[in-house]
């Protein structure tokens, strides 16, 4: 009798586990309005400080600079509020202050406070309309940023610290087998990523460099914001666009 | 009894897998420039009711070569591996070779005077608000910059004479004749698209001599040590220094520097 109840207990746990995985697999996070996709609220110190929290728009910055510039050269972390940005650091020319110094971009003077410290009620909607000439894609910002870059419609700088910077040419295309039998495999183009990112943005923290040696790399964790999900949930094109990674999938 | 153990085991596996999953697939926090190369040594400290030691590589490497501590003084290359005791230091081993009241501060009883316990905190400093005598950012402000780690190009700083490295400690080191270092050589990158590596013996020898790497980390016969980049990221081979103290291997092109074919 004890054995049967134990078996029941274990199988119930297993069913629960599978159900959990399945709901997470199909439960994509809701998408905001295209103009709001990639917007980040930085409220690390709200409550302690008198200034309202900061809203940051990825779409208005990535037309000018690649991801590499901020997330590598300026050392912004890949998660909201994880970077210890302070007003003092900005004024010293770190983080936002590297550009927002009154020369490259508006500075840290009183009339501009509200440009960033605005509780997310910012003007990104208006700025977003300026991007209406960029190629369309169905999800996220509804902008095909890759195509915009390749066709020269935007020319983001890949470095602000080194004028002679040349990214390494690395074009290897990886074929990734899907874990589920009926799902066609995914493709990973290094070259498309290299145009925006530095090797060190992904390696070795997020992905090992040795093929097939990254553990727990599956959709469940990607949907939790790990692996590809570090970018492809909130900033780069979202996971709703299955066929962009799994080319043989419809939809 | 057996069954309840099994249930416990299954539950434990669930917990472990969910905790483990937290640590993978995300970007780690990069240490601040002044934290890079800091090592916490806590073999015996907490057990004895004292704060663990925080050792700053940047402060020491601005005065001494790596070789002096890691070869002549016998410090291991991994935190906690050396098993340093207070008694060792007082006998002039390890830290005590310099921290003896002559070369640098000490807590030892000197000439029958009371020991200066105010110095304890200067090393046993974890969790304490200790203001160092040399402030990192002030110290490195005119140094050539690099992209990672301490954000200091230590190699260039040494070449420019901004820091002068001492490679000899009286009573510990033994002077030998100079050796001519082998010339730079190329190491083939395993992956076709990666530029090959140029390894400079000379640049390394300024800091490390020969003994720090040979023969334990690298055999001396060319191409006989088989290693790959993942092993380096895991702290082996070049990763024994590059990633925790010397510039990090995330800066690909610093080593993969040949012309692209």
Label for each model-derived stretch:
Chain A
Residues 1-4:
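Positively charged n-region of N-terminal signal peptides that target proteins for export
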Residues 8-16:
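Bacterial N-terminal signal peptides
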Residues 20-251:
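Short sequence/structural segments immediately N-terminal
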């Amino acid at each position: 009798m004890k054995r049967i109840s134990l078996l029941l207990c274990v199988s119930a746990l297993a069913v629960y586990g599978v159900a959990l995985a399945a709901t997470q697999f199909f439960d994509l996070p809701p998408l905001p309005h295209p103009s709001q996709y990639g917007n980040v609220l930085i409220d690390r110190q709200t409550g302690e400080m008198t200034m309202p929290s900061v809203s940051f728009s990825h779409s208005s910055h990535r037309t000018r600079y690649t991801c590499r510039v901020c997330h590598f050269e300026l050392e912004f972390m890949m998660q909201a509020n994880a970077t210890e940005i302070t007003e003092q650091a900005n004024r010293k020319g770190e983080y936002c202050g590297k550009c927002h110094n009154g020369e490259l971009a508006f500075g840290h003077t009183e009339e501009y406070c509200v440009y960033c410290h605005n509780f997310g009620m910012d003007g990104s909607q208006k700025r977003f309309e300026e991007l209406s000439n960029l190629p369309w894609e169905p999800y996220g910002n509804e902008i095909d940023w890759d195509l915009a870059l390749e066709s020269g419609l935007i020319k983001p700088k890949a470095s602000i610290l080194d004028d002679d910077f040349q990214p390494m040419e690395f074009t290897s295309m990886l074929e990734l087998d899907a874990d589920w039998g009926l799902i066609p495999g995914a493709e990973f183009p290094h070259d498309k990523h290299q145009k925006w990112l530095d090797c060190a943005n992904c390696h070795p923290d997020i992905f090992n460099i040795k093929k097939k040696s990254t553990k727990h790399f599956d959709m469940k964790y990607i949907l939790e914001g790990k692996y590809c999900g570090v970018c492809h949930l909130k900033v780069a094109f979202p996971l709703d666009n299955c066929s962009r990674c799994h080319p043989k999938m419809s939809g | 009894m057996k069954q309840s153990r099994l249930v416990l085991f299954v539950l434990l596996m669930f917990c472990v897998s969910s905790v483990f999953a937290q640590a993978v697939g995300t970007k780690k926090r990069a240490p601040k420039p002044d934290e890079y190369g800091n090592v916490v040594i806590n073999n015996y400290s907490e057990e004895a009711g004292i704060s663990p030691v925080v050792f700053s590589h940047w402060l020491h490497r601005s005065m001494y070569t790596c070789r002096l501590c890691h070869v002549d003084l016998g410090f291991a290359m991994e935190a906690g591996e050396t098993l340093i005791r207070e008694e060792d230091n007082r006998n002039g081993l390890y830290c005590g070779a310099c921290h003896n009241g002559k070369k640098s501060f000490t807590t030892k009883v000197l000439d029958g005077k009371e020991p200066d316990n105010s110095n304890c905190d200067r090393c046993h400093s974890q969790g304490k608000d200790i203001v160092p005598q040399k402030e990192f950012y002030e110290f490195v402000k005119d140094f050539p910059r690099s992209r990672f780690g301490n954000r200091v190009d230590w190699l260039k700083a040494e070449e420019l004479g901004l820091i002068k490295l001492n490679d000899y400690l009286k009573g510990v080191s033994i002077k030998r004749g100079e050796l001519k270092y082998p010339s730079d050589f190329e190491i083939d990158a395993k992956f076709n698209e990666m530029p090959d590596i140029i390894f400079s013996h000379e640049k390394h020898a300024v800091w490390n001599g020969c003994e720090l790497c040979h023969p334990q980390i690298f055999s001396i016969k060319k191409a006989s040590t088989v290693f790959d980049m993942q092993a380096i990221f895991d702290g082996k081979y070049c990763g024994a220094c590059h990633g925790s103290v010397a510039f990090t291997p995330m800066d690909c092109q610093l080593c993969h520097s040949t012309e692209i074919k």
